[in-house]
Structure formats: C-alpha cells, structure tokens
C-alpha cells in the first residue's frame, strides 16, 4: 500500500501489540486502554471495516476510544495512508494547468466552496473538488449543490478529468476515493465522534491525498460553530494537516478563520446556493466575499499564478460564467427555480437596541432541526429548509423587527428549532466586540 511518510518520530513506549490474527475487540481494547496501534493493526482495521469484516458498532467503539485517548502523529499518518489505500487515487499531473484544491473543516453558513471553485478556475487553475455532505450541525457542499435541479455529484474519474480540461473545475462526491473514510465519516456523524482531532485530520487528508491536486489550502474553522471550538486544538489540527500534506508532496497551507458567528446571512442548502450566486454576481455579504477572495489568493499563489486578481474575475463576470458552465456540465439547471420550503416562521425582536453576537452553533442546530441536516446516514435533507439572518451583530434593531426567518417543509419542527435559537443571540444597548474573520495563516 502507498504509505504516508513517517514524518514524526515513533514513540514505541506505549505500543500494545495486537496479535497477528487481529480481531476488532483487541484493537478496540488497545486504544481504549491508552495504547498506540501498530501499523499492521491500523492497516487491518481499515481494510476490514471497508469490506465489512469489522461491524459498524465495533468501529463506533473504536472511534469513541480514539476520541477519548487520541492518536500520536505516527498513528495519524498511518491511519491516513490506510484510508488513501482503501480506494482509487487520481493523478492530474498531465493537465496543462496547475491543480489546486481547498477544504474547509466545516462551519455554519459556509458556502465558500460554491463561489470559490469557479473563481479560481476562472483565474487559470484547475480545481478538482471532492466534497462531502453535512456533518453534525455543519452543512455539506454536496447537499447544497444537489438543491439545484438536475445537478449530479456522481462523476467517474474519467469524467472529472474531462471536466477539468473543459471547464477547469469539478465538484464531486469522493465516490471510490478513500471509501473507508466515506463509511467512517457517516458513522462519526451519528455517534458523537465528529470532534476527534485525529479522525478529522485523517478524514480530510485521506480524501485530498487521493484526489491528486498539486496544492491544497485548508480553511480551519475556530469557534462555537466549528467542529472544535478551542483555538489551540484548531492550531494543532491545522499544523497536523499541513505537515501531512507537505510530507506527501502536496503544497499545503492553512488559514484559521472565525466561526463564532455564521458566515453570511443564510444557513441551509438552497438558501446558501442563492447567496453564493449573489457573490458571483458581484454582491453578497461582506464576510463571504472577504473569505472567498482571501482563499482564492492563497490558492492561486500555491498554484504559481498569484499575479491573477480574483476580485477582477468577480467584477467582470468570468467567475459567474465558470460557475454556470460547471453546473451545466454536471446536469444542473440554474434557470429552474431553487426549492422553497413549504412553511416559514419568524423570530422578531422583543425590544429595540443593537444586535449582539449570534452563536453559530445555535443557528446551525436550528437549521439541522428544520431539516437542513440529517439525523442519521441515508436520510434525505430538505433542500429548502434553513435559517435566514436579517440582522448581523452590531446592526440596529427596532422592536418587533424580524431577526430570523425559519424555513421547513414540516412545521412541527419549528418548536425545536426555536428552542435551539433561544439564548443564541441577544439585543442590547451596546454593540458586541468585533473579531477578525481571518485569525492566522499557517504555511509549510
């Protein structure tokens, strides 16, 4: 199997040997008791889980043990390599343009991929974007794009290559790439193991290493709406992923970005597609535009075409044209109306004042309750469900004015969604302190 280089020295003092016969209970017990899994144990458990010899409940137990006990960097490197080896690996080195990709660790209202991918393609790079579905309270790019009538994310490797040549970009389901991660990703979503740093790092990097891009920019979210709220943990995650990428010949860089408040004014699937179209048309919320342009600049720099101005591609319409071509190439119809939820309800201000902080986690959970996310793997999301934010932190609010509009096809969900929002915002006499959107940059 192709291996991720052991870029960190192994510490064998905590190795608990797994017998050569290998069985899931022994592997689980090893990690439960604080031991370090050997390379052979990791190779076996990933292969066995992929082909069904390790049951879902057994992998759930192992994931929980990893959440509580952690992994050292040698284990993370091997776990990542095993997931890469579980499926197909793409190679775009023969394309006439540089390849670069972006990955976000997940946030609330994070629709950045939608304008970013065509924007970077319009500036001359090829962007092979293997994306995922919603995870926990965070939205998924594929769920958003599939709210566009006719859009398909199921592309073969040959079709991805053809589309990169013709359009310069493709946004697709990982499919045969790292199938072990696809199974584990869905399992983590429903077993409260989303927040494990080793599992986040290996999940992201296994797909990205298998994807074959020459460069990668990571958007590591920090704050209440991120998969991990602690800035220290997010820094460790960013450094781990940058080192994994660089050790495997992928030029990798990370931005730490704020996710204490939702990005933009919408959280949901079709709602976020509509907002992404506003950005591509030269408008859109300032925070979405700022982060899109900054990530585009980083991607173009790593691709060796940093002299291109992504803001110009937004202004002159070339990014919008590239998005339309991308959607059409994947069967989507942007001329058809986006789905609209059957029911809406509004949260209004009880008093006047200034909008305080809006908690990203509260809004993300409200959207999830409304049907924008899924309670278990295989459940369909509601394309039109979600939350629209009418007042951003620091903006003036009048008594009785709408603050949020909630959308769903099933009105009995409103109560639970409003309960999630309750306490997640405030209106008071003083504007909240402002936070920088971009916290730090971590390079190779």
Q: Which residues does each PLM region occupy?
A:
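Alpha-helix C-terminal capping segments
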Residues: 68-69, 115-128, 207-212, 247-248, ...
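Active-site-proximal beta-alpha loop/turn segments in soluble metabolic enzymes
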Residues: 63-66, 144, 181-190, 219-228, ...
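Acidic, glycine/proline-rich low-complexity segments that act as flexible tails and inter-domain linkers
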Residues: 4, 8, 14-109, 122, ...
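Phosphate/diphosphate-binding glycine-rich loops and adjacent basic-rich segments that engage nucleotide
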Residues: 165-213
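Well-ordered secondary-structure scaffolds
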Residues: 22, 26, 31, 36-39, ...
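Glycine/serine-rich anion-binding loops at beta->alpha junctions
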Residues: 98-121, 125-138
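A glycine-rich helix N-cap at a beta->alpha junction
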Residues: 144-170, 239-245, 249
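Short beta-strand segments
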Residues: 130, 164, 172-174, 219-223, ...
């Amino acid at each position: 199997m192709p291996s991720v280089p052991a870029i960190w020295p192994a510490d064998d003092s905590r190795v608990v040997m797994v017998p050569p016969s290998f069985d899931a209970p022994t592997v689980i017990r090893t990690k439960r008791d604080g031991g370090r899994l050997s390379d052979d144990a990791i190779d076996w458990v990933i292969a066995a889980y992929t082909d069904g010899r390790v049951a879902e409940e057994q992998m759930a137990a192992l994931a929980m043990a990893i959440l509580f006990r952690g992994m050292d960097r040698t284990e993370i490197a091997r776990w990542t390599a095993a997931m890469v080896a579980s499926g197909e690996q793409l190679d775009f080195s023969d394309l006439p343009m540089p390849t670069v990709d972006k990955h976000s660790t997940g946030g609330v209202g994070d629709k950045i991929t939608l304008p970013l991918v065509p924007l970077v393609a319009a500036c001359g790079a090829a962007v092979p974007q293997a994306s995922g579905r919603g995870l926990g309270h965070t939205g998924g790019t594929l769920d958003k794009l599939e709210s566009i009538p006719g859009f398909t994310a199921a592309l073969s490797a040959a079709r991805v290559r053809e589309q990169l040549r013709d359009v310069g970009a493709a946004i697709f389901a990982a499919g045969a790439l790292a199938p072990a991660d696809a199974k584990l990703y869905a399992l983590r979503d429903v077993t409260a193991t989303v927040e494990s740093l080793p599992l986040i790092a290996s999940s992201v990097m296994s797909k990205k290493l298998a994807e074959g891009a020459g460069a990668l920019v990571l958007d590591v979210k920090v704050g209440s709406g991120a998969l991990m709220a602690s800035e220290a943990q997010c820094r460790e995650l960013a450094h781990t992923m940058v080192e994994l990428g660089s050790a495997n010949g992928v030029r990798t860089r990370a931005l730490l970005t704020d996710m204490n408040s939702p990005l933009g004014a919408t959280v949901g699937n079709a709602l976020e597609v509509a907002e992404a179209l506003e950005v591509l048309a030269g408008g859109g919320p300032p925070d979405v535009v700022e982060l899109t342009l900054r990530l585009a600049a980083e991607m173009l720099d790593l691709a060796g075409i940093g002299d291109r101005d992504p803001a110009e591609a937004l202004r002159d319409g070339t990014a919008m044209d590239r998005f339309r071509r991308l959607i059409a190439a994947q069967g989507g119809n942007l001329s058809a109306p986006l789905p609209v939820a059957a029911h809406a309800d509004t949260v209004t201000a009880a008093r006047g004042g200034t909008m305080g902080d809006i908690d990203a986690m509260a809004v993300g959970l409200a959207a999830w309750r409304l049907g924008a996310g899924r309670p278990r793997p295989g459940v369909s999301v509601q394309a039109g469900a979600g939350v629209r934010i009418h007042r951003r932190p620091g903006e003036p609010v009048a008594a009785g004015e709408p603050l949020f509009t909630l959308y769903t096809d099933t009105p009995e969900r409103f109560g639970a969604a409003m309960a999630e929002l309750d306490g997640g915002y405030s209106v008071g006499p003083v504007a909240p302190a402002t936070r920088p959107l971009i916290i730090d940059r971590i390079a190779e």
